[in-house]
Amino acid sequence: MKHFLKPFFALFLLTNLISSCNSKKEPYTVKFTSEKDTLSYVLGAMNAKTISESRTESFEKLDKEQVIKGFNANLAGTPAEACLSTLQQLFGPTYQDFNPSYLKEGSLCMGKLTGYAFYYDIRKLGALDRVNFTMVKKGFEDGLYRRDSTVIKPNSMRFIMSEFITGLNVDNGNKMLEKAKKIPGVQVFDNGIVLQTLQAGKGPNPGATDDVKVHYILTSALGDTIQSSYRGDQNGKVEPIPLSLNGGVIPGWSFAIPKMKVGGKYRIYVPWNLAYGEQQGKESLCFFVELIERGAAGSFTNPIKTNQQ
């Protein structure tokens, strides 16, 4: 993780050097001395876009210097709940209006809330030591004034962000898996899956190609709930989810579910390569699973067959 940006960072510096030598007009530049600087600048600029791209008309009216002041002042993570009512005064109860009498105070609060959210997220991800807050401030300012794209091209920014998030996902996933291995009584398999029995089932084990009905709660490596079948459908109806173990679930489930017994409750810790892989940023995941029922392939997931004449 430490050197995940090195090849790109070297290319970025070389490109900037060549372009500055070939241009007659001195371009707007920012000096980066490390990968940490580059990443921090990008993080700041991307956070500015959460303001500049969310409410285009209102954004143009904001006092940008006050937004920057609020953001910089609140990067220590000071809660700013009082600012919520101020923003309602600025934008109205439905956030469709704009009251210029609250311009200065509201702009300051916009920055404070953005700064707090940024600090909170970075701290939760365990990445405070990977960020140079001085460069975050610079990136935020440039992003707010829309000059960040002259420093780093948008595609390059997206690449840097993707690599950063993926690296954090891998690190946090590994921490989750290592912690899970130390839980008394868990089963640890060679492929990295950790299976914890919370309540032993008394029914049969599903076969490798069976259908099953389950309830489940999916959480991230940091413990955030992503999905839950217990929440029910759009009508509030809570029913077990029918799934096919033969291609209808992630590889981690195809491996772990047959090791469960109907009626049991389990927790599966799944490495990223047996979850959704690279397409979901190499996230390792945790599933609480209540195995309700099993049936032969096609019992729960195939369409109802009509009688042939």
PLM region spans:
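Bacterial Sec-dependent N-terminal signal peptides
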Residues: M1-K31
